[in-house]
Each structure stands twice: as C-alpha cells, then as structure tokens.
C-alpha cells in the first residue's frame, strides 16, 4: 500500500515541478516601454543547455509548446525533463508580451507588427538573456510555421554559435498572389473559436479522421481567448493578432526565398506531418538543400500529422524526433571536440 502512495506522490511532485513556468519580461531597447515575454521551465539541475521554442503566425507559446495537455505534460516540460532549460518566446503583440499602441488603433494606421525583420531582433533578445542571465552555453532553437523564417535569419546572423535549428512545418509552399491581395495593416483579427476550427484541418484530413488531442478540444479555444486583451468595440471573442507574419507569408518573395539559408552554419532539421498544408516532401527537400553550409541536415515526415502536430495525438513522436536530433548534434559536437584535442597532442 505504501509503495503506490509514494509513487503517486513522486509523480505529483514531478508534474508540479514541470508546471512551474517562469515568465520574464525582456525589454526591447529599440522600442522604449515595449517588452517580449519568455516562458521557461527549468530542468532539475542546471545543464548550461537550453531549447528555445519559437511560435508561428497566430498563437503564442502557452497555446503551442507551452500548452499543458495535463499537469506536467507540455513540450516545454518534456524538454525540461530531459535536462534543458526549456523556454518559449512570445513575439511582440502576442501572449504575455506587450501590445504596441498601433494594436489599439485602426490597422491601416501603421505597418504590420512583428514582421520577420523585427522578430529576428526579438529572438536575439531572448538568446542574449539565456546566455548572459541564465548562463546557458548551448542554445537549440525549435521554430514552428512562420516562426521558422525569423529563426533561420537569426541562425544566419549568429555566426555559427547556435547549436542547432529545427524547422517544424516550415512555409515551403508558394502562396497564390494576385492584384486583389489586400495590403496588410498593423493587425488582423479572428475569434479563438474560429482559429480552433481551422486547427481541425477538415479540408485535408479524411472525413472520419480527428487528430487534435482531447485537451485541445476542451480547453484550447478558451485559453487562446484569455491570452489577449479584448478591445472595447470589437465583436465578442475577437482577438487582435499582429499582421507581420501574414504579410511575410503573402510577400512576393515568400516561400523558399523567405529563408536566409545559404549562410547558416548550424545543423538543421526539417520535420513535418504528411497532412501539413505548408510543406510536403518535395518542398522540405528543396528547402533543406538551400542550407548548403550546414554541417548536419536531417529531414523527417511523421505520418498522421498536420501543420499543428504539436497539438495532436502524435505529438510525442514530434517531441522524440526533435530530441533525437538535438542529442545527435550534441554527440557530434563532443566527438569533434575530442578529435580536435587528440589531433593537437
């Protein structure tokens, strides 16, 4: 009787530890009064290693890598349990980050907020914090969807210091553009329930196939609605979302040309589901080929997964695939360092 009780207490303690998400606000020097939020789950003991998660175009960290399907069950918690300081960045205007004044004005009054050129700077702020304040020496970035564009640009700028770059569901398809494509303002809007319905990907999944986890069906839309302030005068449940990411995706040079891949000297992993609407086998192969200076390149397709596989029933395969790549990178780094040391003697 005592053994099951102790086991239950130990499991509860582990879950509670994994749920301790610390959120820090990091100022944006170029924008006085504005800040980005970084959500972190610490490992049991410091390792000097971190995984930084970068979200996509419409919803923030705590609806993505930080979404808890059950106590202690999130991608952040998974990475922390494996010894990494697991952090997720909310870009400006998303989640717990600040909202610039333009998000309270009509969208046509300002250019798109948090476009890739600005998001690169925000990733740099998070990485600088991890290195200087959390004493991290090894940083792996895991980016999703549109977030893979600024993450790649940051990897190119970071001059080989980044340990690895994972591109989950990158934007490898060219989106149709015509003269009727509207110009983007500062922000766009959607209700949480509308975005949830989009996550079901009914247009590409077989009629009887449902991939979303039950916890997403139960809690995701309400959590998304609570993640952003409601602006008086907007319709009930309407969320204002920075338009920079959508403007990047719709730009004439979008698709493969969006990625500053040719100068990246970091190991790269492209992972996606067979039902992903933004990348397929050919697109993933073409994008990976652009990383001509990357010393290690992996590509993985996980069947029965969509563009939001991190919210679906096969998410643990995604977690494990990324973890395997990260550990392969670290093993290679150790082997290379050992070889260099032996050669020097």
Which role does the model predict for each range below?
Residues 137-142, 146-175:
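Conserved hydrolase catalytic core segment
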